[in-house]
UniProtKB/Swiss-Prot annotation:
Region (Disordered): 451-481
Lineage summary: Eukaryota, Metazoa, Chordata, Craniata, Vertebrata
Descriptive protein name: DnaJ homolog subfamily C member 3
Domain notes: The J domain mediates interaction with HSPA8. Binding to misfolded proteins is mediated by a hydrophobic patch forming a large groove within the first two TPR repeats.
Principal subcellular localisation of the protein: endoplasmic reticulum
Record organism: Rattus norvegicus (Rat)
Subcellular location(s) of the protein: Endoplasmic reticulum
GO CC entries: cytoplasm; cytosol; endoplasmic reticulum; endoplasmic reticulum lumen; smooth endoplasmic reticulum
TPR repeats: 37-70, 72-104, 105-138, 154-187, 188-221, 222-255, 268-301, 306-339, 340-373
Classification via InterPro entries: DnaJ_C3_Co-chaperones, DnaJ_domain, J_dom_sf, TPR-like_helical_dom_sf, TPR_rpt
Positions carrying Phosphoserine: 274, 475
One Pfam short name: DnaJ
Length: 504
């Protein structure tokens, strides 16, 4: 329920001199009110004063039905319509009041206000002039004179706006239209004209705002819905485009342009929806294929190409295809350097490629655009840890595998290197010492990378075998002397080393 105070405020805004309720010089005997109608009028007045607009409206409907020639009933119903923001419904009631009582200056003045807001300037001027000729009160005369001057000024500005539009001076036309629409707020044609100016000036979202207003101000405005749908489509907002073109077809299911556009946007919407569902399911290769279909389905609107590449960039990054991800993410970032999603996805790809400086740069650029994004903050911290780690021991490099290598690849690389660097393969003490160190690193790399939890820690920038990075500072079994490793490997060649070395 609307609060009474709110209603009174609204009434005051729509009726400067007001009507709530003019009763009183016009009531009773002069109107010839019968008992039932008078009851409805009185009850409606009380409900209106209490802010119960819907109930008040019902009473005034009943009064009009009971006495179709009662101008007070129409006038009070117009009051409620205006308080409810229904100016279109109020206007016929005010016109009926004037037909029934030509000297009712309050109704004529109020109708002039509504006509002025609708941009019907000649009709508004006619009402204001008639008020001035009808022996108005001092306040009514002052108000009518003021509004007449305003209507004349709007006529002049309208002519200037049209001249500017015809001369393709859209900036000037917008300036004039801005001023007019502050007064003629319900003029659908002027809003549509300003929307055209905004389109010409490359401001589609402002055009959409005016066209949405025009679609409400003018009945069955299929053209406005069609234009809104086209603008959303060009902006890449396929879902809103589909919604608006459906509104057009609700009004006219045979509208040729709306139907043709509906088929196109529906097809595109389905493709994009399917692609996003595949991404949610982790089916990145299939999602990439879908977005390639999107680009083929709509090659003429650049926004869909950019958005599709942005999502393909994401798919490649998540699917651990860093080379492909970096390439297409970079294409997006050439067009949109501040695209946070592309920056994050390329940064992740750089991490896989062990390009830590580049990853840090991308995360920092993304953070400038969205400093509160936890994913960016965590990614940046990880990249910084990995950079620091890369300057120490890198288990992936030791085994010669990529960061996204599978366990089978890790074991295979480990076996090959363990055989190659087994100390028994070397004769001189210097070579053996070098092999010992290499062999220990290889064993450590295998230990870390074949254990999921240890590998996760290492991938996050923490060396699980480095005592300095462990809480509590415990000893590190892989940072011991070679003597402690004797007995580790099963290779035995009669040399000084005896190992038990198990390939897992």
């Amino acid at each position: 329920m609307v609060a009474p105070g709110s209603v009174r405020s609204r009434l005051g805004a729509v009726f400067p001199f007001l009507l709530v309720l003019v009763d009183l010089q016009y009531e009773g005997a002069e109107c010839g009110v019968n008992a039932d109608v008078e009851k409805h009028l009185e009850l409606g007045k009380k409900l209106l004063a209490a802010g119960q607009l819907a109930d008040a409206l019902s009473q005034f409907h009943a009064a009009v039905d009971g006495d179709p020639d009662n101008y007070i009933a129409y006038y009070r119903r117009a009051t409620v319509f205006l308080a409810m923001g229904k100016s279109k419904a109020a206007l016929p009631d005010l016109t009926r009041v004037i037909e029934l009582k030509m000297d009712f200056t309050a109704a004529r003045l109020q109708r002039g206000h509504l006509l002025l807001k609708q941009g019907r300037l000649a009709e508004a001027e006619d009402d204001f002039k008639k008020v001035l000729k009808s022996n108005p009160s001092e306040n009514e005369e002052k108000e009518a004179q003021s509004q007449l001057v305003k209507a004349d000024e709007m006529q002049r500005l309208r002519a200037q706006a049209l001249d500017a539009f015809d001369s393709a001076d859209y900036t000037a036309a917008i300036t004039f239209l801005d001023e007019i629409l502050e007064v003629c707020v319900w003029d659908a044609e002027l809003r549509e004209l300003r929307a055209e100016c905004f389109i010409k000036e490359g401001e589609p979202r402002k055009a959409i705002s005016d066209l949405k207003a025009a679609s409400k101000l003018k009945n069955d405005n299929t053209e406005a819905f069609y234009k809104i749908s086209i603008l959303y489509y060009q902006l890449g907002d396929h879902e809103l485009s589909l919604s608006e073109v459906r509104e057009c077809l609700k009004l006219d299911q045979d509208h040729k342009r709306c139907f043709a556009h509906y088929k196109q946007v529906k097809k595109l919407n389905k493709l994009i929806g399917s692609a996003e569902e595949l991404i949610r399911d982790g089916r990145y290769t299939d999602a990439t294929s879908k977005y390639e279909s999107v680009m083929k389905a709509e090659p003429s609107v650049a926004e869909y190409t950019v958005r599709s590449k942005e999502r393909i960039c994401h798919c490649f990054s998540k699917d651990e295809k860093p080379v492909e991800a970096i390439k297409i993410c970079s294409e997006v970032l050439q067009l949109e350097p501040d695209n946070v999603n592309a920056l994050k996805d390329r940064a992740e790809a750089y991490l896989i490629e062990e390009m830590y400086d580049e990853a840090i740069q991308d995360y920092e650029a993304a953070q400038e655009q969205n400093e509160n994004d936890q994913q960016i903050r965590e990614g940046l911290e990880k990249a910084q840890r990995l950079l620091k780690q890369s300057q120490k021991r890198d288990y992936y490099k030791i085994l010669g595998v990529k960061r996204n290598a599978k366990k089978q690849e890790i074991i295979k690389a480990y076996r090959k290197l363990a055989l190659q660097w087994h100390p028994d393969n070397f004769q001189s003490e210097e070579e053996k010492k070098k092999a010992e160190k290499k062999f220990i690193d290889i064993a450590a790399a295998k230990e870390v990378l074949s254990d999921p939890e240890m590998r996760r820690k290492f991938d996050d920038g923490e060396d699980p075998l480095d005592a300095e990075t462990q809480q509590g500072g415990g000893s590190n079994p892989f940072h011991r002397s070679w003597d402690s490793w004797q007995g580790f490997n099963p290779f035995s060649s009669g040399g000084p080393f005896r190992f038990k070395f198990h390939f897992n």
